[in-house]
Amino acid sequence: MCIRDSHLPGVIAAMTPLPVIGVPIKASLEGFDSIMSIVQMPPGIPVATMAVNGAMNAGILAVQMMATGDAELMQKMIQYKESLKQKIVKANKELSEVKYKFKRIEI
C-alpha cells in the first residue's frame, strides 16, 4: 500500500463482504494520520485495524480467522501460540538467572 493510500482498507471494506485488515504505515505524524484514516469507518463498514507497521499481527489475525473453519490450520495456530509462550518462559528463566551487583550511593 502506498503511504498516501491509507484510505484503501476502507474502500475495500465498502466493496466486499469479506473481512478487511488495515495496517497503518508510519510516515508523517508517526503514523497517527494513517491510523485515523483506517479506524474512523462509518457504521456497517468495519476494518480490523492493526498497530502502526503491524503487518505481522495482520497476518496472524488472518490465519486465526481462516482457522475457525479449518481444524488443521487451527492446530498449527495453537502450536504457534504455544511456541511464543515457550519463548517467553525461556526468556524469563534466563533473565531470572542474571545477577547484578549494585553499589549503593548515599544522597
Model-derived features: where do they sit?
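Short, small-residue-biased leader/transition segments that mark boundaries at the very start
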Residues: M1-I3
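Short acidic loop-to-helix transition motifs that present clustered carboxylates
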Residues: D5-H7, E30-G31
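Short Gly/Thr/Asp-enriched flexible loops that form oxyanion-binding sites at enzyme active sites
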Residues: H7-L18
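Proline-centered loop/turn at the N-terminus of a beta-strand
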Residues: P19-I21, P46
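Short, acidic/turn-prone active-site loops that include or flank metal/cofactor-
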Residues: I25-S28
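C-terminal binding/interaction regions
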Residues: E30-I107
